[in-house]
Each structure stands twice: as structure tokens, then as C-alpha cells.
């Protein structure tokens, strides 16, 4: 209720009290000729009581409405508190993930990379780069070098396989030549024996 409504209610209460006292006095003492009619005072009292009842009903409705609004605000506050706790939990979880990530031994630290100084000698255009960009450039250069070496390795492996195949073919040819030579030598033994006998 507003302050004006409360003030009006208090005024009505005061006038109601006055009317009640007036009725009480009339019952206690005999009426004078100029006194008001008790029925008229009762009607005034009833009208004041109706005003008070209406004020009471309005104040009750306002109380119910205030309780509803308070419950809604409390619910919103509880939901906001729950959301805040969820955000704090997420924040803590993300901090833990970041901490674990920062403490983790990264694979690039175990790679035998070229030093920053050597890289900058070969690539002076990266001298003004920050550490992150410089590391990315070193890793990219390392990747290109490894891809080049991998391609070279594949070519050498193909060449090795071709040489092995060629050597195998030549070895087979030599073995066949040896076999033919052995066969020839074996077949020439009787001829040699014949010439040895005839030459004696």
C-alpha cells in the first residue's frame, strides 16, 4: 500500500473509533434532543467499515501480488546463482585444461629442430617475428625439409630396389654362365684325355 492509502485508512479508523465511542455514549446516557439519531451513526459506521473492508481486500491483493513478485525475483535470483556457479565451474575446468596444456610436453620440443639463430641466418625475413610466428616458421621449414628428404629417400629406395633387381639378374646370368662353363669343361674332359693319350 502507498503512504497515502495507509494515511486514509488510519483516518477512517480514527473516525470509526469516534463513531463507536459515540454509540457507546448514547447507550450509556439518555439522549438529548439535539443528539444525532443512533441509526444515522450506525449507517455512518457501516460505511466506514465497508471502506476499511475494501482497503483490507486491496491490501491483501497487494500482499499476494508482492509475494508473487518476490517469489519470481527469488526464482530469477536462484537461476542466476545457478548459472553463475555453472560459469565458475566452466571457468575452473577451462583453467585446468589450459594449465595441463601449458605443462604438457609438446611434441615439437622433442623434435631435433634447427636453432633459432641458424634459422634466422638462413631466413632473415623472420627477424622481426614474435616467438610464436618464428616457431611456426621453423616447424614449417622443418616439415618442408622432411618432405624433401622423404621424397629423396623414396627415390633412393626405388633406385636401390632397381639395383638389387639388376644385380640379381646379373648374378643369375653369371650362375648360368658358370653352369655352362662347368658343363663345357666336363664335356671337354674326354677330348683332353684323348689328346693327352695321342700326344704320348
From Swiss-Prot:
Function, as annotated: Component the THO subcomplex of the TREX complex, which operates in coupling transcription elongation to mRNA export. The THO complex is recruited to transcribed genes and moves along the gene with the elongating polymerase during transcription. THO is important for stabilizing nascent RNA in the RNA polymerase II elongation complex by preventing formation of DNA:RNA hybrids behind the elongating polymerase. The THO complex is also required to maintain TRAMP complex occupancy at sites of snoRNA transcription thus promoting exosome-mediated degradation of snoRNA precursors.
Cellular component, GO annotation: cytosol; nucleus; THO complex part of transcription export complex
Any one Gene Ontology BP term: mRNA processing
UniProt KW Cytoplasm keyword: yes
Encoding gene, per UniProt annotation: tho5
Keywords: Cytoplasm, mRNA processing, mRNA splicing, mRNA transport, Nucleus, Transport
Keyword rRNA-binding applies: no
One Pfam family from the record: FmiP_Thoc5
Compartment list: Cytoplasm; Nucleus
Assembly notes: Component of the THO and TREX complexes.
Name of the protein in question: THO complex subunit tho5
Organism expressing this protein natively: Schizosaccharomyces pombe (strain 972 / ATCC 24843) (Fission yeast)
InterPro entries noted in UniProt: THO_Thoc5
UniProt family annotation: Belongs to the THOC5 family.
Disruption phenotype: Results in increased levels of H/ACA box and C/D box snoRNAs.
Amino acid at each position: 500500500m502507498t503512504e497515502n492509502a495507509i494515511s486514509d485508512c488510519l483516518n477512517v479508523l480514527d473516525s470509526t473509533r469516534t463513531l463507536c465511542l459515540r454509540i457507546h455514549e448514547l447507550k450509556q446516557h439518555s439522549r438529548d434532543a439535539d443528539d444525532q439519531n443512533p441509526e444515522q451513526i450506525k449507517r455512518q459506521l457501516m460505511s466506514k467499515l465497508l471502506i476499511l473492508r475494501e482497503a483490507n481486500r486491496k491490501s491483501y491483493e497487494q500482499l499476494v501480488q508482492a509475494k508473487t513478485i518476490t517469489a519470481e525475483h527469488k526464482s530469477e535470483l536462484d537461476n542466476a546463482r545457478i548459472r553463475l556457479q555453472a560459469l565458475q565451474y566452466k571457468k575452473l575446468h577451462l583453467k585446468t585444461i589450459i594449465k595441463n596444456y601449458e605443462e604438457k610436453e609438446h611434441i615439437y620440443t622433442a623434435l631435433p629442430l634447427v636453432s633459432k639463430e641458424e634459422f634466422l641466418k638462413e631466413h632473415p625475413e623472420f627477424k622481426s617475428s614474435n616467438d610464436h610466428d618464428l616457431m611456426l616458421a621453423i616447424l614449417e621449414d622443418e616439415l618442408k625439409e622432411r618432405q624433401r628428404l622423404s621424397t629423396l629417400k623414396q627415390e633412393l629406395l626405388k633406385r636401390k630396389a632397381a639395383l638389387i633387381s639388376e644385380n640379381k639378374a646379373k648374378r643369375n646370368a653369371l650362375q648360368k654362365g658358370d653352369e655352362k662353363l662347368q658343363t663345357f669343361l666336363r664335356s671337354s674332359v674326354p677330348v683332353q684325355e684323348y689328346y693327352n693319350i695321342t700326344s704320348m
